[in-house]
Amino acid sequence: MTDRDVPIDLVLHTPGGLVLAAEQIASALRKHPAKVTVFVPHYAMSGGTLIALAADEIVMDENAVLGPVDPQLGQQPAASILKVLERKPISEIDDETLIMADIAEKAIRQVKATVIELLADRMGAEQAEHIATMLATGVWTHDYPISVREARELGLTVSTDMPPLIYQLMGLYPQTAQRRPSVEYIPLPRSREPERRQVRGSPW
């Protein structure tokens, strides 16, 4: 356990994952009394964004992105399942779809409530509600990249003052092959020409 007076710096580089795990991590971070800063050097989608919302400050690379947190039921977005109820009479919808729609409605309500809970003590209730609606109810596709500008327009506290040490840290972790498409972090030189290494005994 981190001491209550010790700040937490967390680097997020993830396509997301289980809502349960993300909510547990986010809840623990939100309860931490000292400052919590999340660093996003490239992307933190879905559950990664949910965790980021628990931070006091989000630091993103200028080209990094967050993503919507709308729940997915298997391969289907929960919000899209609910659209079926709006577009077809109940008599034309099979029982399995109706059951999935019930689960989808509950899932969206639960995730939206989590987002509001994470944000409410740092902004007004109305703004927290707005952000939760935008992120959790299927306004965008689940893989929509939310840029720094859009994150700020939503009302999130986002900085682009990424410490160089974060990039160096990312370069130390090899990326393992993944079955599902993702983003591989490949560290590149941060200057046009690499620094010359001086050879001992050489004037150059």
Range-by-range predicted roles:
Residues M1-T37, A44, V59-D61, P71-W204:
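N-terminal organellar transit peptides
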Residues G47-G48:
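Acidic, divalent-metal-coordinating active-site segment for phosphoryl/phosphodiester hydrolysis
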Residues A55:
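Extended, alpha-helix-rich binding/interface surfaces that flank or overlap catalytic cores
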